[in-house]
């Protein structure tokens, strides 16, 4: 899902 991609992106940024 798109939300999953966002979560992964945020985790990667953090």
From Swiss-Prot:
Taxonomy, superkingdom: Eukaryota
Q: Can you say what this protein is called? A: Unknown protein 14
Q: Which organism is it from?
A: Pseudotsuga menziesii
């Amino acid at each position: 899902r798109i939300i999953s991609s966002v979560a992964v992106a945020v985790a990667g940024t953090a």
